[in-house]
Design a protein with these regions (language model features):
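Acidic/polar loop patches that form or flank catalytic/metal-binding clefts of enzymes
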Residues: 2-6, 67-81, 123-130
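Proteolytic maturation boundary segments
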Residues: 1-50, 54-55, 61, 65-69, ...
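Juxtamembrane/interface motifs at transmembrane-helix termini
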Residues: 149-153, 214-217
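M16/insulysin-pitrilysin zinc metalloprotease superfamily fold
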Residues: 71, 87-148, 169, 183, ...
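Short amphipathic C-terminal alpha-helix that caps PH/PH-like domains
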Residues: 1, 60, 64, 111-119
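A structural supersecondary motif
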Residues: 37, 61-102, 160-163
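Hydrophobic, mid-to-C-terminal alpha-helical segments
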Residues: 150-162
């Protein structure tokens, strides 16, 4: 853990004790958009416990985003796009948010649809298979990070040191982060995700923003939104089923192809290979990024 005697001003935003509801029309707004920001205490990566919670949060985000993206495969959905995220608000608070672009003639239906997909998770929880995939992807990410450590983009290093200075986040590096992940991930359960997901439902500490093109005349009111929300809570929803087909993209074993021509370009240290099937391959080993540095202030 990084320790410091630095003192910083407290920036905790008091609890709203209500839903702050905003409806805005703008001639430059091209599509109808709803955003629901739920205020939470900021998760600071000062302790191992918080690192575990950050994994849990990120797994929730990733799984829900995949679910929302899957629902968009149905062309009859009233949504154009849907998303879930978290963002910094102050040094002490952050937003847990979700939102969607709504089809122009189906705004209320689109809000109902979005809220129902989130309610589906509240009622049925996450799937063990979903959690397993997230854990595997996380381990793969760190394994790749270790392999590419020498060519890591400098802006990510600068961002990490910045968080260490401003938020007291510890700095560890990919190898140590990999060890921590291997230690923590087996302890994370579906119940952890189900409980953490409730942070996206702060009914008395949130901002609901609806942005509409100026041409939209049927502007939804706060009362109408609350009524939709109450109706959705009464739905009896089944467990999520992805609209993506769970099958291999390539089912057949692909045959190889012989190299029929090779050529070397010494001036640029590149080899050209032409294959029997017509494919050209250019191979250029490089260490160009190993000593590069980028900085932005």
């Amino acid at each position: 853990k990084a320790k410091s005697n630095r003192s910083s001003p407290k920036a905790t935003i008091p609890k709203y004790n209500k839903t702050i509801f905003l409806t805005l029309t703008d001639p430059e707004q091209k599509e109808s958009l709803i955003i629901i920001d739920n205020k939470n205490k900021k998760l600071k990566l000062e302790k191992i416990k918080n690192v575990k919670n950050s994994y849990i949060r990120n797994f929730c985000l990733s799984i829900i985003q995949k679910r929302l993206t899957s629902t968009l495969q149905d062309k009859k959905t009233p949504l154009i796009d849907a998303f879930i995220w978290n963002s910094d608000l102050t040094s002490e608070n952050e937003f847990y948010s979700y939102g969607a672009f709504l089809k122009e003639k189906e705004i209320k239906k689109g809000i109902d649809f979005l809220l129902a997909e989130l309610e589906r998770v509240k009622q049925n929880g996450f799937l063990p298979k979903e959690l397993e995939i997230e854990k595997k992807d996380t381990i793969s990410f760190y394994e790749q990070s270790i392999k590419s450590e020498k060519t890591e983009e400098s802006d990510s290093l600068v961002a990490e040191y910045t968080r260490n200075f401003l938020e007291n986040e510890f700095v560890s590096g990919p190898k140590e982060e990999y060890k921590i992940a291997k230690q923590l991930l087996p302890t994370i359960t579906v119940s952890d995700l189900n409980n953490h997901f409730l942070n996206w439902f702060k009914y008395d500490d949130r901002i609901v923003s609806i942005l509409l093109p100026e041409k939209i005349k049927d502007v939804i009111s706060e009362k109408e939104f609350i009524n939709i929300e109450k109706k959705v809570k009464k739905y009896k929803l089944s467990q999520f089923k992805s609209l993506y087909k769970d099958e291999l993209l390539i089912k057949d074993n692909l045959p190889g192809s012989k190299i029929i021509f090779t050529k070397k370009y010494p001036s640029i240290n590149t080899h050209e290979f032409r294959l029997e099937n017509g494919i050209k391959v250019f191979l250029k080993p490089t260490k160009n990024k190993e000593k590069s540095f980028a900085f932005e202030a």
